Design a protein with these regions (language model features):
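Gly/Thr-rich phosphate-binding beta-strand-loop-beta motif of the actin/hexokinase/Hsp70
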Residues: 236-254
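Nucleotide/phosphate-binding catalytic cleft detector across ATP-hydrolyzing
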Residues: 1-238, 264-272, 284-365
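A beta-strand-loop signature enriched in Asp, Gly, Thr, and Trp
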Residues: 251-283
Length: 365
């Protein structure tokens, strides 16, 4: 199943190819491919209108979004515009593959005007959100499965937002507080009402999960802790690494409690630099200042965190090959034989420990 960021990006690109304005509305969601598609749409000289909540997908500062050529309007105004526009799924702008027609794309990938005056030029509505609630319901119903959930678990990567200072520092402060309190890793999974306000994307995804669950309990987490918890052994003692597409996180867990954490952006790392950071982190030599100077988030290790800790470092995540062939003593973790579901297993494990699993409502888990 493609990520929502990819789906939304395809819908925007299709509208660009059809030379149609876009109305983008809904909650804040993950960026990346959708942001690139928005920039290409604006560069093609086409209007891109976004409700304030959806516009936060592209930057936490709406003035920065406006500077990129997006017309940012109140959510209510975006909804009114959407009422007179065509949904992306029904616009005909996206075909079965959701991609632009080849006749509209030049050799460089730029969108070209065809000069076809008969084209429908009404705006296309593109809905934001990390979960497509109605789409998921339709898939389940199409398979004959009742969309009645015992519980819904959701995880997204969220840098966090602060109106003052650095988002990178604010995100790492969440790790530092958890370590200072020596909290169990399971405490980094929150019921819907307890998701910290700084995690705006996760709160938005949690609201969609609540809508999907229709009253079922919801558990939410960042993707980093979800994957790490899925890979953590029953003993609760381990050095764990999740080499994700966005972030790489290493934690030291003792008796299931956080005793150390290092976090960086995966795009800034190669195998040699990651191994070097990990060695210095586990030696107690790496500082948050050094990591931040390199564009990462930070590093902190509790005194005595590694005393008596035996066994190899456990590595998971889609970018785990960064450490393949390294000189570190490590093991590639694939819970239940499927590395790409490590985060899902972490969510289910936390749900079970939080008492959410097994609450039968006669439907789907």
């Amino acid at each position: 199943v493609p990520s929502r960021t990819q789906v939304v990006a395809r819908q925007i690109r299709a509208a660009t190819a059809a030379r149609r304005p876009v109305v983008f509305l809904g909650p804040v969601m993950g960026g990346g491919p959708d942001g690139a598609a928005m920039k290409a749409h604006v560069a093609a000289g086409l209007p891109f209108i976004a409700g304030e909540s959806a516009a936060l997908t592209f930057a936490d500062d709406l003035d920065r979004v406006r500077a990129r050529g997006v017309e940012v309007v109140a959510d209510a105004e975006a909804s009114a515009l959407a009422a007179e526009a065509v949904p992306a799924e029904a616009s005909g702008a996206a075909g079965a593959s959701g991609t632009a027609d080849a006749s509209d794309v030049g050799a460089t990938g730029d969108v070209e005007a065809t000069g076809d005056a008969s084209r429908d030029t009404r705006p296309v509505v593109v809905r934001s959100g990390d979960l497509d609630v109605e789409g998921l319901r339709q898939v389940l119903q199409g398979l004959g499965v009742s969309p009645c959930f015992d519980a819904v678990c959701v995880a997204v990567q969220d840098h966090g937002f602060t109106s003052h200072g650095s988002n990178r520092v604010a995100r790492f402060a969440f790790w530092e507080q958890a370590l200072s309190d020596r909290r169990p890793l399971v405490d980094l999974f929150w019921p819907a009402d307890d998701v910290p306000a700084t995690f705006t994307r996760l709160r938005a995804a949690t609201a969609l999960a609540t809508e999907l669950g229709e009253g079922a309990p919801v558990l939410a987490a960042d993707t980093g802790p979800a994957a790490l918890y899925g890979a953590m052994p029953e003993s609760g003692d381990a050095v764990l690494v999740n080499a994700g597409n966005g972030h790489t996180v290493c934690v030291v867990a003792r008796d299931g409690r956080l005793a150390g954490v290092f976090e960086h952006h995966t795009s800034a790392l190669d195998g040699a630099s990651l191994e070097r950071f990990l060695r210095r982190f586990l030696a107690g030599e790496l500082t948050s200042a050094e990591v931040r100077e390199d564009g990462g988030h930070g590093a902190v290790l509790a005194p005595g965190a590694l005393e008596g800790l035996a066994g190899p470092m456990l590595v998971t995540g889609p970018r785990r090959d960064l450490l393949r062939g390294s000189g570190l003593a490590l093991e590639f973790a694939a819970p239940h034989g499927d590395m790409m579901l490590t985060g899902c297993y972490g969510l289910l494990r936390a749900a079970g420990e939080r008492g959410l699993a097994g609450r039968r409502r006669g439907g789907t888990s």
